[in-house]
């Protein structure tokens, strides 16, 4: 594990939220948000109304900017998100998780909790000097972000699907290059015969 469990979960959830904005947008309705809420493992207050959907959608560009920024801008964004939410870090233990930090209460609005959890995770990334783990997928045509949690920081793609797509494209390119090379057929002269 590169970071504490709660940090890794928050990074994964933040990237997943940002990636919902990529075409086609996958947060178009309150039902889409309800599905995302469950799949991303969120707990606590979830109004499930249009206002909450709007607030969550408006958070996505801020998180993407924070993810891709240089370190001084990341710090500024983190501090701004924490300040706006009046975040107050508390050590807590709940469910199956051991002691960890939360800087919001479960009763605060979902978008606020999402912003603060992402900001708190980025605090850990910054403090450990691991910002190079915040990446954009290398697959052609994909702009998804992800946290590279591999041991050697070598992950290049946001998903297995992108990795497979790029591997297949590279194979087709190699195959095409091999097919374009002149072959030595039975009737062609060799260098010695010329």
Range-by-range predicted roles:
Residues 1-136, 140-148, 178-194:
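Short helix-coil boundary/hinge micro-motifs
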Residues 152-163:
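Cysteine-rich micro-motifs
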């Amino acid at each position: 594990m590169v970071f504490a469990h709660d940090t890794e979960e928050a990074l994964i959830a933040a990237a997943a939220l940002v990636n919902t904005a990529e075409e086609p947008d996958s947060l178009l309705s309150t039902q889409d948000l309800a599905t995302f809420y469950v799949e991303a493992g969120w707990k606590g207050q979830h109004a499930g109304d249009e206002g909450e959907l709007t607030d969550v959608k408006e958070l996505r560009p801020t998180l993407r900017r924070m993810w891709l920024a240089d370190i001084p801008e990341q710090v500024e964004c983190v501090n701004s998100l924490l300040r706006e939410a009046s975040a107050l870090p508390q050590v807590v233990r709940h469910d199956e998780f051991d002691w960890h930090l939360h800087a919001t209460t479960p009763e605060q609005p979902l978008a606020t909790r999402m912003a603060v959890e992402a900001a708190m995770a980025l605090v850990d990334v910054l403090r450990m000097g691991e910002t190079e783990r915040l990446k954009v997928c290398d697959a052609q045509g994909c702009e998804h972000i992800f946290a590279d949690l591999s041991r050697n920081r070598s992950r290049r793609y946001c998903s297995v699907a992108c990795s497979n797509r790029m591997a297949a494209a590279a194979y087709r390119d190699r195959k095409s290059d091999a097919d374009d090379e002149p072959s030595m057929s039975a009737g062609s002269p060799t260098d010695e015969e010329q």
